[in-house]
From Swiss-Prot:
It is found in: Secreted. PANTHER family: INTERLEUKIN-10, INTERLEUKIN-19-RELATED. Belongs to the IL-10 family. One of its GO terms (molecular function) is cytokine activity. Disulfide bonds join 31-127, 81-133. PROSITE patterns: INTERLEUKIN_10 (PS00520). Glycans are attached at residue 135. GO terms for biological process: immune response; negative regulation of B cell proliferation; negative regulation of cytokine production involved in immune response; negative regulation of inflammatory response; negative regulation of interferon-alpha production; negative regulation of interleukin-6 production; negative regulation of membrane protein ectodomain proteolysis; positive regulation of B cell apoptotic process. It comes from Ovis aries (Sheep). This is Interleukin-10. One of its GO terms (cellular component) is extracellular space. Pfam families: IL10.
Length: 177
């Protein structure tokens, strides 16, 4: 679960933007520049993941993949928007809170990674053409089912494959630009 101070900060920010007379101009402007800023945002997410990647990949002792080709196919297909939205929510609400329980250093880095993912989600939501959806993805449901079956090992598996998730985000976004 996101910390209450982070949620409060986001709500105050969003209220300020909504109250602004130029809110739609700001949103349109940021959406115009979003495709150009996406590589930088993904680079930041990758760098944040790099700080915990080795830890989680060393702990992941499973030979199977959690993030499968069917998920990438959903990202590239008509369910891409929903698959992306659900996977961001899955990592923020299910994976990362459990991943933070592996010591203060890991918690700090996972928290930073989560904040960068939240920022990306916020930008995607502001630019409706990138995230205008509500249908459920069967591939995401499969990822969640396997994650839950793996119990504690699911955290290691999901976090060790976070770089694959970043690549899937990039693949989805390139189809939308």
């Amino acid at each position: 679960m996101p910390s209450s101070s982070a949620v409060l900060c986001c709500l105050v920010f969003l209220a300020g933007v909504a109250a602004s007379r130029d809110a739609s101009t700001l949103s349109d402007s940021s959406c115009t520049h979003f495709p150009a800023s996406l590589p930088h945002m993904l680079r930041d997410v990758r760098a944040a993941f790099g700080k915990v990647k080795t830890f989680f990949q060393m702990k992941d002792q499973l030979n199977s993949m959690l993030l499968t080709q069917s998920l990438l196919d959903d990202f590239k297909g008509y369910l891409g928007c929903q698959a992306l939205s659900e996977m961001i929510q899955f990592y923020l609400e299910e994976v990362m809170p459990q991943a933070e329980n592996h010591g203060p250093d890991i918690k700090e880095h996972v928290n930073s990674l989560g904040e960068k993912l939240k920022t990306l989600r916020l930008r995607l939501r502001r630019c409706h053409r990138f995230l205008p959806c509500e249908n459920k993805s069967k591939a995401v449901e499969q990822v969640k089912r396997v994650f839950n079956m793996l119990q504690e090992r699911g955290v290691y598996k999901a976090m060790s494959e976070f770089d694959i998730f970043i690549n899937y985000i990039e693949s989805y976004m390139t189809t939308k630009m």
